[in-house]
Amino acid sequence: MFGSLLYFSSLQRSVSTPAREDGGAPIRSPFDVFLERNGLPQQPNFNESPIDHSRRLRTLVNAPGFTPQFVTSNPNRADGQFQFHSQPFEFGPTELDGLRMFLAEPAGPVASPAELAAGKIGKCIACHAAPNFADFKLHNTGTTQKEYDAFPSHTGGASFFSLPIPTLATRTANDLPATEQHPTASDRFRSIPSDTTTLTDLGVWNVFANPGMPAPQAKIRTILCDGQVPCPLSDAILLDRAIARFKTPALRDLGHSAPYMHNGQFDTLDEIITFYRDTSDLARAGTLRNGAIELQGIALTAGDNASLVAFLRSLNEDYQ
């Protein structure tokens, strides 16, 4: 977790070689250039959390007197364009509209009917706060449930929501991933659910309290316990919390990382935003198994997709 944080911080401070056309200037996204051009904060202040930094940025870009200076070319290259992306290097009104949606939060934990009708609330910073756009934690956003329920063999009443999953007391070595100690384990909860309704991918459920994987246990326990140290909850309770959770991906340079999600489930950013609109509805209806509570605050309409996609594309950088 902390290694990833250092890695992404190093990317932000990375400098290209002098032989490059940009003359050794820092590699930045259109979003980063937009922040600099408008005197907006690019990093959290001392002792400021990423989410508070993101909220401060939201206040500034929504201020009545804010007059944005847009980005129309790459200041680090003679042709003004990306070197490794085919899209224009720009941050304009559509990207700003998407940024405002990305930073927006509902008035309460759950989006109200009025907020759902109005849209434009992504609540993305709950897990993807700037500047790294990842909280390096574990969440269930519904990818496993969508994958499981999509297979025709699972129709006729079978669903991920009702799938029997072993508890800590009933989980056996055969339920877990294969290790040196248990080389013939079935991996049935770390599998693609295409052949049988007994297969699915439960993410960190396979790792937590797994005696064959001792190294990450302390970090996982802290995340599942929402940062409480020492954790007052039993491993049995935490195992239920671990169902279908996966590590938050960072959002910088997504143009080089398709297909998306841990299982390559989506080919486009538009599909992902539609997915979040759908799973947020499931979360509010109580039909998303072990879903992240943050999903209930998303209030987006179909018309919001394009602006959010434009903003996410503005996070692309010239890394190979």
Please annotate each region the language model reported.
Residues 1-320:
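Periplasmic c-type cytochrome electron-transfer domains
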